[in-house]
Swiss-Prot record:
Chief location category: cytoplasm
Top enzyme class: transferase
Species lineage: Bacteria, Pseudomonadati, Pseudomonadota, Gammaproteobacteria, Enterobacterales
The protein's name: Acetylglutamate kinase
Molecular function per GO: acetylglutamate kinase activity; ATP binding
Summary of the function given for this chain in its UniProt record: Catalyzes the ATP-dependent phosphorylation of N-acetyl-L-glutamate.
Length: 257
């Protein structure tokens, strides 16, 4: 069975209640299904807190965090350090054997600089499945942060949705993007069950899909095209629905290629 990548985002890492619900759902799912799971995470809220504490400015361009050279070390520490190890600690608490990774481990996801104007922000592309497949075959839950490294050794901050997409392409995995919202909402705040590229373009033009959600929707559309299968955007808030989601039942917005 092909693996399932669960991308975690939003304020999930800040909420003990949400993490408890998520990991309880993961335990229940793993007990009843043999399907291998991989977690990919960002941690914007962890980074924002740290930057605020250090009195450093947070600047975004087109929904992507601008990452100057003097901030990449701090952001790496927050994402590959604090955020990653927090998730590993929760996995340990729930008796799930897990391994913490970043995109560069085993060359799992290849990363190049996206745009000089964004600084240390990376473009993620499929890499080698060897390391993660080996971990999955031995029953481990890989927990992968969205920090990558270029061929010339430069650390890069990668949008976590895009990182998860590249890793899904690497592994031939299905992909779920878990976030703060229950899916993509229309102009009246109602959840849209299915989304196509043309519908997304229309909602972006109308200003209904904005900022970070544009990045999320485009990442999901890219993933659906690259993988040749639908990608789900859903909320982690409804933990009781997560096992159904992991089984392929849509509970948020299903993005069609």
């Amino acid at each position: 069975m092909n693996p399932l990548i669960i991308k975690l985002g939003g304020v999930l890492l800040d909420s003990e209640e949400a993490l408890e619900r998520l990991f309880t759902a993961l335990v229940n799912y793993r007990e009843s299904h043999q399907r291998p799971l991989v977690i990919v995470h960002g941690g914007g809220c962890v980074v924002d807190e740290l930057m605020k504490g250090l009195n450093l400015p947070v600047k975004k361009k087109d929904g992507l965090r601008v990452t100057p050279a003097d901030q990449i070390g701090i952001i790496t520490g927050a994402l590959a350090g604090t955020a990653n190890k927090t998730l590993l600690a929760w996995a340990k608490k729930h008796h799930i054997a897990s391994v913490g990774l970043f995109l560069g481990d085993g060359d799992s996801v290849k990363v190049t600089q996206l745009d000089e104007a964004l600084g240390h922000v990376g473009l993620a592309q499929p890499g080698s499945p060897k390391l993660i497949n080996m971990l999955l075959e031995n029953g481990f839950l890989p927990v992968v942060s969205s920090i990558g490294v270029t061929d010339d050794g430069q650390l890069m901050n990668v949008n976590a949705d895009q990182a998860a997409t590249a890793l899904a392409a690497t592994l031939g995995a299905d992909l779920i993007l878990l976030s703060d919202v229950s899916g993509i909402l229309d102009g009246k705040g109602q959840r849209i069950a299915e989304m196509t590229a043309s519908k997304a373009e229309q909602l972006i033009d109308q200003g209904i899909i904005t900022d970070g959600m544009i990045v999320k929707v485009n990442a999901a559309l890219d993933a659906a095209r690259a993988l040749g299968r639908p990608v789900d955007i859903a909320s982690w808030r409804h933990a009781e629905q997560l096992p159904a989601l992991f089984n392929g039942t849509p509970i948020g917005t299903r993005i069609l290629a």
